[in-house]
């Protein structure tokens, strides 16, 4: 049976660092308040001339290089994002153009912070079908464009960044071992941008009421996350026919330190085996899990044969996890 996995990873974060002390200058908050409640110290913000597709392209070039393939070997692009360059056009098509590729199918996928994991399962299924050989999966966001810099409860949480993976055939016995994804649509109002869509188009009133920015019911998100992360990871492990102690490392969605700590306790898995970089990048939504994995690979923390879990949750509400036996 064909084994399918990640052939190469890449990630990119903008150069502009925005610290908690920078927030102290513009809103009523403090480094201590942010750090103790979230675990975040700083985050990256895209420059004025950078769009989501620009970040995605940078990460993609690194993934292609690390997969040791040429750009022309890529036969599909899937871009998970909530912050596409334009409303009526998929940013994946813009990435295709920036990479200098032609004709290959490209589409955006919106599963909020779980988007990268959703994209991995879609790519896995398409490669398994035999229709495609090397699918580029990207998670990319410019969340700084949709956060309200007057709302201290949300603006301090988010950052910009991108991660990309090449999905294709890997050495037999390695690669994806199990997936679990799902959604609870009845909770769709917990995390959203109220205006700007077909339900409530932007107008003078929505802009005045600051409805074109992210709003979030923090306590509801916390409760959902700490209960869902262990369950969805356990389900993916069951499909992979593994136990939690078979894992070398877990790469959780980088939303909040307290969420990750609570999930670790419920999973009865050592916190030190949860890779975390949210202190430096904040919550980059669909990019967060991929950025964490890409960074860990660069540091030599992920080795061939390691069993790792990628797990996340997001607006929708969505959730997902995949278990991978690392192939290189």
UniProtKB/Swiss-Prot annotation:
The pathway to which it is assigned is: Lipid metabolism; fatty acid biosynthesis
Q: What keywords would UniProt list here?
A: Acyltransferase, Cytoplasm, Fatty acid biosynthesis, Fatty acid metabolism, Lipid biosynthesis, Lipid metabolism, Multifunctional enzyme, Transferase
> Recorded E.C. number(s)?
2.3.1.180
Q: Which CDD domains match?
A: KAS_III (cd00830)
Has UniProt tagged this entry with the keyword Oxidoreductase?
no
Catalysed reaction(s) here are: malonyl-[ACP] + acetyl-CoA + H(+) = 3-oxobutanoyl-[ACP] + CO2 + CoA
GO BP annotations, alphabetical order: fatty acid biosynthetic process
Query: If you read the UniProt record, what top EC class would you report for this enzyme, in one word?
Result: transferase
User: Per the annotation, which location comes first and is thus the protein's main one?
Assistant: cytoplasm
> Please, which domain of life does this record's source organism belong to?
Bacteria
The UniProt entry's GO CC annotations, sorted and at most eight, read: cytoplasm
The annotated region (ACP-binding) lies at 254-258
The family assignment reads:
Belongs to the thiolase-like superfamily. FabH family.
**Main role?**
Catalyzes the condensation reaction of fatty acid synthesis by the addition to an acyl acceptor of two carbons from malonyl-ACP. Catalyzes the first condensation reaction which initiates fatty acid synthesis and may therefore play a role in governing the total rate of fatty acid production. Possesses both acetoacetyl-ACP synthase and acetyl transacylase activities. Its substrate specificity determines the biosynthesis of branched-chain and/or straight-chain of fatty acids.
The family database entries (PANTHER family) matched by this protein are listed as: 3-OXOACYL-[ACYL-CARRIER-PROTEIN] SYNTHASE, BETA-KETOACYL-[ACYL-CARRIER-PROTEIN] SYNTHASE III, CHLOROPLASTIC
Q: List the HAMAP family hit by this protein, alphabetically.
A: FabH (MF_01815)
Protein name per UniProt: Beta-ketoacyl-[acyl-carrier-protein] synthase III
Q: Origin organism of this chain? A: Fusobacterium nucleatum subsp. nucleatum (strain ATCC 25586 / DSM 15643 / BCRC 10681 / CIP 101130 / JCM 8532 / KCTC 2640 / LMG 13131 / VPI 4355)
The gene name on file is fabH
